[in-house]
Amino acid sequence: MEAFTTHTGRAVPLRRSNVDTDQIIPAHWLKKVTRDGFEDGLFEAWRKDESFILNRPERTGATVLVAGPDFGTGSSREHAVWALQNYGFKAVISSRFADIFRGNSLKNGLLTVVLEQKIVDALWELTEKDPQAEVTVDLEAREVRAEGITAAFELDENARWRLLNGLDDISITLQNEGDIATYEAKRPSHKPRTLQV
């Protein structure tokens, strides 16, 4: 997983609330188990509308999604996180996220930032007025900055540490590989064990 410290990029203002994971990535995309190749499925139904925000040329290459409240509701699917990442998003800002979606995001390296709705509104206004406006998401300082906007955000220490160091569940486990091997070597052969393939 790539470490996240500070990211600056252009934003997409997604003025929609209660965006569920099926809207983020429809169920027929869930047949794959790899983490790549989901960018075309991101908001697939909405992207059929030529006027949808992601279809606008000035939004190409944007890396920060500024979404409405209750983003990521619905069923738990890591594919929704992967689709956002595959498309190029590094952070999603909203006034409220579904808990499971937020947990999946943070475990997969996608920073979800909770800000007051009035700050989200200000970011929408700024990025609608100027599609080239940049938004900085600073995890070290726990701050979002844009022209005329500075807003602090909270994130639990464990999630912050994992993101700052680029650690997912597997890489954290692998930090203890030596101790695990020592334990397994001492374990009686008649008991279940992990085998190296």
Swiss-Prot record:
NCBIfam families per UniProt: leuD, PRK01641.1
GO cellular component terms given for this protein: 3-isopropylmalate dehydratase complex
Record's catalysed reaction(s): (2R,3S)-3-isopropylmalate = (2S)-2-isopropylmalate
Source organism of this protein record: Streptomyces avermitilis (strain ATCC 31267 / DSM 46492 / JCM 5070 / NBRC 14893 / NCIMB 12804 / NRRL 8165 / MA-4680)
Keyword Cell wall biogenesis/degradation tagged: no
Keyword Amino-acid biosynthesis (UniProt): yes
Any one GO biological process: L-leucine biosynthetic process
Superkingdom: Bacteria
Keywords from the UniProt entry: Amino-acid biosynthesis, Branched-chain amino acid biosynthesis, Leucine biosynthesis, Lyase
Enzyme class: lyase
Quaternary structure note: Heterodimer of LeuC and LeuD.
Protein family membership: Belongs to the LeuD family. LeuD type 1 subfamily.
MF-aspect GO terms: 3-isopropylmalate dehydratase activity
UniProt EC number: 4.2.1.33
Cross-referenced InterPro entries: 3-IsopropMal_deHydase_ssu, Aconitase/3IPM_dehydase_swvl, AconitaseA/IPMdHydase_ssu_swvl, IPMI_Swivel, LeuD
Transmembrane segments: none
PANTHER family: 3-ISOPROPYLMALATE DEHYDRATASE SMALL SUBUNIT, 3-ISOPROPYLMALATE DEHYDRATASE SMALL SUBUNIT 2-RELATED-RELATED
Pathway where this protein functions: Amino-acid biosynthesis; L-leucine biosynthesis; L-leucine from 3-methyl-2-oxobutanoate: step 2/4
The protein's name: 3-isopropylmalate dehydratase small subunit
Job description of the protein: Catalyzes the isomerization between 2-isopropylmalate and 3-isopropylmalate, via the formation of 2-isopropylmaleate.
